[in-house]
Amino acid sequence: MHTMYRSIHLGTLLVLSVPTLLACGSRPVEVAAAPTTKQAQPKRESDSIVVSSEVGGLDEDAVNGVFEKVQSGLTNCVRKGARRVELLGGDVAFFVGINLSGQAEDTRVERSTLGDRETESCMIAVLKSRSWPKPVGGRKGQVHKAFSFDMPNEARPPVEWSADDVEDTLRKLHRRADKCTGGSGTYQVTAYIDTRGSAISVGVAPPDTSGEAKVDCLVEVVKNAKFKSPGSYPAKVSFEL
C-alpha cells in the first residue's frame, strides 16, 4: 500500500498583494515582509481590524496549523474516491479566500491532475468547514496551497496520454464545452479513459471563482464524449477547454 500523500508542505504562501501559487513539491517559500506604509499596521490578533486594502495579511503559523488539521480529511477524500476510481492519484492546488470572520467563503481548485470531480469537491468541503485566521490590514486573506497524492490502490499506473492523443475528440468537444462556460476562460481538465474510449472519471480546475459553478456541466460534457481506445489498459490525460 502506498503512502497516501508523498509530501504535504506546510510552508503556506500568504498573499499581501498579487497571489503567487506555491508549486507542488517545491521548497516552502518564505513570506515577503509587508510593504512599509505611512499608516500604522494593526496588531495581528486585534479584534478591531483596520481595513486598508482589499487583500490583507495572515498569520502564517495559524494557517499552517489549519492545514495540519485538514490533512486527514483530505486523505479520506482520496481514499473514498479510490473506491470508485481505482487509478486515482495526482496533484491538486487550492485557492482559499478568507473573509474578516475567518471563514473560507471562496475556495476552489486552482489546478489538479486528480481527475475526479467528486474527490475535488470533497476536499473543498473539508477546507470550507474549518475556521481560518482573520486577515489583517485588508478585507480578504488569500492562501494558495498544493498537495500531492500517490495512488492508494495497489495497481499499475494508467497509461500517460498527452492532449495530442485526444486531439480529435477535443475538436468536437469545444462547441459543447462553450455552452457550459459561455466561452470565457480556460478550464483545466483531467480524465481517466477506459479501454472502450469512455471517460471513467473527470476532474476540472476553473479559471476563476465564477467558473466553479460551471464545472459540473463541463464534467458531464467530457463524460459523454467518445475518445479513442488506449488499448488494453486505461489512460490518463490532461487538456484544456
Regions found by a protein language model. Give the residues of each.
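Charge-biased low-complexity segments
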Residues: 25-241
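C-terminal motif of bacterial Sec signal peptides marking the signal peptidase cleavage site
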Residues: 21-23
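Bacterial N-terminal signal peptides that target proteins for export
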Residues: 2-15
